[in-house]
Amino acid sequence: KKNSKKISNKLNKIISEINETKTYDNKTTIIIKRLLQKELPERLRKKICRKIFNENFRTSEKKIAKEFYLNLSEIKTIKRYGNEIGSHSFNHLWMNSLNSKKQLSEIKKSLQFWKKNKLINKKWSFCYPYGGYHRTCIKNLKKLGCSAAFLVQNKVNKINEFKKFELNRVDCNQIKF
């Protein structure tokens, strides 16, 4: 009974956030994404995702990832053509759902990868996964030498409202193709 009330509260919270979310996903899709991204316990999320994957794909996660995600060589090519590479955390978790220690771990692991592969500059940026952050995350980014961080607000940045750790960016899910 206690768990069902907790889940009900989470669903109500997600539903109230949906009205503020500007995306082309329908409400059901947004609810399912939020549950699988952060609201359910991590072990349960992984179990559900693995089951969904195995029921819908007749290949390994590794093969899917190889086909749909950039590999190191492709990322180096992007960098060579003058693009900046920033951090986005290591496991793509909602930063506002993590404590300070876990945030630092996520950011540091990501930076280690980028530095090891010579893909990040001294002045590096960070993009909050899903746009989720809080003040502790900003403090941690500053502590690690980050120069700027991006939200998912689907807005234009205004010079008179410039906050370098709360810069707007457009999420690809907010663009109709």
Locate each region found by the language model.
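Generic signal for short, ordered secondary-structure residues
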Residues: 31, 57, 89, 119-120
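Extended, charge-rich helix/loop segments that form flexible
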Residues: 1-81
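Residue-level signal for the start and early helices of compact helical domains
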Residues: 23, 61, 76, 86, ...
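Residue-level signal for pocket-adjacent positions within structured domains
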Residues: 65, 90, 162
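Alpha-helical scaffold elements lining the catalytic groove of polysaccharide deacetylases
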Residues: 67-84, 91-119
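C-terminal active-site subregion of NodB/CE4 polysaccharide deacetylases
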Residues: 1, 6, 97-177
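Short beta-strand segments
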Residues: 53, 86-89, 124-130
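Short hydrophobic-acidic sequence motifs that mark active-site Asp/Glu residues
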Residues: 84-86, 166
